[in-house]
Amino acid sequence: MTPAVSPAHTVLFEAKARKGISFEQIGKAIGRDEVWVASAFYGQAKFNEEELKKLSEVLEISSAQIVKELGDQWFPNRGLGPVPPSDPVIYRLFEGVLVYGHPIKAIIHEKFGDGIMSMIDCNINVERKPDPKGDRVVVTFDGKFLPYSKW
């Protein structure tokens, strides 16, 4: 099940499909990473006006309309879909956090102290790694460590 996105975001997906281009290609054209671009297409990140104008050129859609709908007045409503997720790929990521979340948390605390890994100041990368037993998916979360403050 694909999560519901706004009509403006649906226009982006339709234009992307019509052009037959990838998030990576769009990202290179507007100066952003493919994961960030995909996130913005789902309404989970916010394009600035310059990015929207570049995006409209890449996708060959109306700049005025997309800026009107996704410009300064629009803000993301982050978090899509049910918990637990029903999509198999998203569920496996969710399962990874359920199974390995506490061990990862313990190691973060051992290496950094009492705090969290930011998902706001975070870069995410998805790579394909060849392997004789079947290609591997490598997902990297590169988040800033934020120590808890004391007062």
UniProtKB/Swiss-Prot annotation:
GO BP annotation list:
cyanate metabolic process
Does Lyase count among this protein's keywords? yes
Its top-level enzyme class, in one word, is lyase
- HAMAP family per record: Cyanate_hydrat (MF_00535)
Q: What does this protein do?
A: Catalyzes the reaction of cyanate with bicarbonate to produce ammonia and carbon dioxide.
Question: What sections of the sequence does the record tag as coiled-coil?
Answer: none
Can you state which reaction this protein catalyses?
cyanate + hydrogencarbonate + 3 H(+) = NH4(+) + 2 CO2
Q: Which UniProt keywords apply?
A: Lyase
Query: Family assignment?
Result: Belongs to the cyanase family.
Q: What protein is this chain from?
A: Cyanate hydratase
* Residues at the active site: R92, E95, S118
The upper taxonomy is: Eukaryota, Fungi, Dikarya, Basidiomycota, Agaricomycotina
- Example of a GO MF term: DNA binding
EC numbers, comma separated? 4.2.1.104
